[in-house]
């Protein structure tokens, strides 16, 4: 397992900041906290580290400015609050970072900007250019146009997508909790704190609880989801409390936090994009033999597919699901859903006779696939990743 190292030894760090850290429901923006955070960022920049910030708080800040009532907001109220809050939030970051002679650049993303390949590449190029000129990208979901059907829904997973998009080697999720426990600590006083998580297993996933604040849409569940996206792409992750001033300095000085080890070596940019897809277009349900073959680094053949779910087109990202019902991989499918159903369970040599044209032998080729669950030993997986990168 890759060992934990000080923040100063990472090359590129994505920092996600929760709404409750930045905004007080009554008092508004926590300016002193933001100034201390920006001083921490300035310290990292002075060491030559690229820093990106995924900042929640637009809706919460706009809500405070507009004096909207507590409780759930209607969609149009959330979008209006975001429109007001985004201006105030960007100005606050710009002013605070400027004290360290750092330029901030605002980027508002929608789900399509990371899920559609061409837009993904455009967004990545813009972010990389900002980093190249020494700026700090301040990234948030564009809540003024996002709807419940087309949104990330939380900035934890958005931050993980940004980390994989930009090739970051560390993702730091700052929240109102100091890390992962075996059970929600506010419900179970006997919950045990986990300092190091070598891999995200079903047992780890089961430990996740819900959101703790009306100002936040995320919770431990979304942080674990973010961890799966980030660590699969070779990016370590830290969950830490941001309640203290200068939380990054606190982490460096030994404050309690949970560290998630990257699950392997970083894969190619194409595979990174595949691994981080938030909404697969469908699913391929496979048998035990296929699971073993995929674990050995082989392609998914039609013979190992038991059933098909969803409607998808050739080239879409699909989830590959094992007999236990758990996703084990993601990949770009070689057939649309209708043809995939027709050849599922059949030998590759039969494809032309069934479909009337000579298709690809693999339902999902190994070069278009990323494992998202642990199969086999970690050393074996790392060798395969390196061989196919």
Curated annotation (Swiss-Prot):
Q: Which keywords does the record carry?
A: Amino-acid biosynthesis, ATP-binding, Cytoplasm, Kinase, Nucleotide-binding, Proline biosynthesis, Transferase
Kindly report, in one word, the top-level EC class recorded for this enzyme.
Answer: transferase
User: Which reactions does this protein catalyse?
Assistant: L-glutamate + ATP = L-glutamyl 5-phosphate + ADP
Is Electron transport found in the keyword set? no
Indicate yes or no for the key word Nucleotide-binding.
yes
Cite the PUA domain residue spans from the record.
281-358
Which positions are annotated as binding ATP? Answer: 16, 175-176
Highest taxon above the source species: Bacteria
Cited InterPro entries: AceGlu_kinase-like_sf (IPR036393), Asp/Glu/Uridylate_kinase (IPR001048), G5K_ProB (IPR041739), Glu/AcGlu_kinase (IPR001057), Glu_5kinase (IPR011529), Glu_5kinase/COase_Synthase (IPR005715), Glutamate_5-kinase_CS (IPR019797), PUA (IPR002478)
Task: Name one process (GO BP) from the record.
Answer: L-proline biosynthetic process
What does UniProt give as GO cellular component?
cytosol
According to its UniProt record, the EC number is: 2.7.2.11
Q: Where are the transmembrane segments?
A: none
A molecular function annotated in GO for this UniProt entry is: glutamate 5-kinase activity
* UniProt family annotation: Belongs to the glutamate 5-kinase family.
NCBIfam families recorded: proB (TIGR01027)
Q: What task does this protein carry out?
A: Catalyzes the transfer of a phosphate group to glutamate to form L-glutamate 5-phosphate.
Could you identify this protein by its name? Glutamate 5-kinase
What would be the name of the gene that encodes this protein? Answer: proB
């Amino acid at each position: 397992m890759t060992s934990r190292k000080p923040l100063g030894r990472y090359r590129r760090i994505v920092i996600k900041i929760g709404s409750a850290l930045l905004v007080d429901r009554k008092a508004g923006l926590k300016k002193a906290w933001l100034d201390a955070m920006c001083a921490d960022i300035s310290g990292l920049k002075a060491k030559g580290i690229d820093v990106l910030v995924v900042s929640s708080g637009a809706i919460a800040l706009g809500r405070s400015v507009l004096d909207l009532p507590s409780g759930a907001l209607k969609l149009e109220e959330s979008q209006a609050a975001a429109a007001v809050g985004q201006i105030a939030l960007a100005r606050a970051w710009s002013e605070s970072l400027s004290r360290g002679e750092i330029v901030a650049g605002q980027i508002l993303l929608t789900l399509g900007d990371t899920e559609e390949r061409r837009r993904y590449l455009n967004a990545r190029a813009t972010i990389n250019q900002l980093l190249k000129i020494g700026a700090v990208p301040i990234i948030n979901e564009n809540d003024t146009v996002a709807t419940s059907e087309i949104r990330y829904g939380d900035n934890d997973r958005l931050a993980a997508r940004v980390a994989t998009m930009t090739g970051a080697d560390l993702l730091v999720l700052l929240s109102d909790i100091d890390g992962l426990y075996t059970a929600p600590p506010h419900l179970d006083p006997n919950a045990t704190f986990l300092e190091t998580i070598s891999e995200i297993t079903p047992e780890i996933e089961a430990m996740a609880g819900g959101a703790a604040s009306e100002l936040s849409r995320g919770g431990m569940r979304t942080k674990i989801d973010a961890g799966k996206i980030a660590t699969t792409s070779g990016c370590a992750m830290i969950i830490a409390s941001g309640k203290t001033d200068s939380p990054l300095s606190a982490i460096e000085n030994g404050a309690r936090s949970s560290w998630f080890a990257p699950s392997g070596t970083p894969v190619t940019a194409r595979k990174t994009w595949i691994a981080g897809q938030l909404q697969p277009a469908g699913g391929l349900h496979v048998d035990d033999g296929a699971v073993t073959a995929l674990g050995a680094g082989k392609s998914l053949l039609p013979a190992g597919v038991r059933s098909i779910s969803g409607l998808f087109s050739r080239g879409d990202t699909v989830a590959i699901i094992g007999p236990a019902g758990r996703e084990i991989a993601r990949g770009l499918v070689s057939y649309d859903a209708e043809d995939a159903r027709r050849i599922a369970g059949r030998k590759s040599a039969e494809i032309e006779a069934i479909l009337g044209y000579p298709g690809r032998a693999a339902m999902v080729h190994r070069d278009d696939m990323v494992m998202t669950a642990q199969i086999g030993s970690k050393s074996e997986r790392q060798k395969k990743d390196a061989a196919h990168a």
